[in-house]
């Protein structure tokens, strides 16, 4: 074995770190798009509690009513 340094390729990340949607710190690959498991769990908790909601347009027609009667 020689004492020469090993030549290794520089690995570029697949995507640039974006700010964590919870706290603003740079995201990490393991928890993308979050920076940590804590932020990821906190976001999941908000979804499960119903803090986030996807808006739905109210439609007054009944989808089960096919107009036969």
Swiss-Prot record:
Signal peptide: none annotated. Binds 1 zinc ion. Zn(2+) binds at residues 20, 23, 35, 39. The lineage of its organism: Bacteria, Pseudomonadati, Pseudomonadota, Alphaproteobacteria, Hyphomicrobiales. Its cofactor is Zn(2+). Residues 1-15 have a biased composition (Basic and acidic residues). Keywords: Metal-binding, Zinc. It comes from Allorhizobium ampelinum (strain ATCC BAA-846 / DSM 112012 / S4) (Agrobacterium vitis (strain S4)). Interacts with GyrB. Inhibits all the catalytic activities of DNA gyrase by preventing its interaction with DNA. Acts by binding directly to the C-terminal domain of GyrB, which probably disrupts DNA binding by the gyrase. InterPro entries: DNA_gyrase_inhibitor_YacG, Znf_NHR/GATA. It holds the Pfam family YacG. GO terms for molecular function: DNA topoisomerase type II (double strand cut, ATP-hydrolyzing) inhibitor activity; zinc ion binding. Residues 1-22 are annotated as: Disordered. SUPFAM superfamilies: Glucocorticoid receptor-like (DNA-binding domain). Gene3D superfamilies: Erythroid Transcription Factor GATA-1, subunit A (3.30.50.10). Belongs to the DNA gyrase inhibitor YacG family. GO terms for biological process: regulation of DNA-templated transcription. Coiled coil: none annotated. This is DNA gyrase inhibitor YacG.
């Amino acid at each position: 074995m020689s004492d020469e340094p090993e030549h290794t390729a520089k690995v570029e990340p697949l995507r640039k770190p974006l700010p964590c949607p919870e706290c603003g710190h740079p995201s990490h690959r393991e928890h993308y798009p979050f920076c940590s498991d804590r932020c990821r769990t906190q976001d999941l908790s908000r979804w499960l509690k119903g803090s986030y909601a996807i808006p739905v347009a109210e439609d007054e027609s009944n989808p089960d009513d096919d107009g036969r009667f």
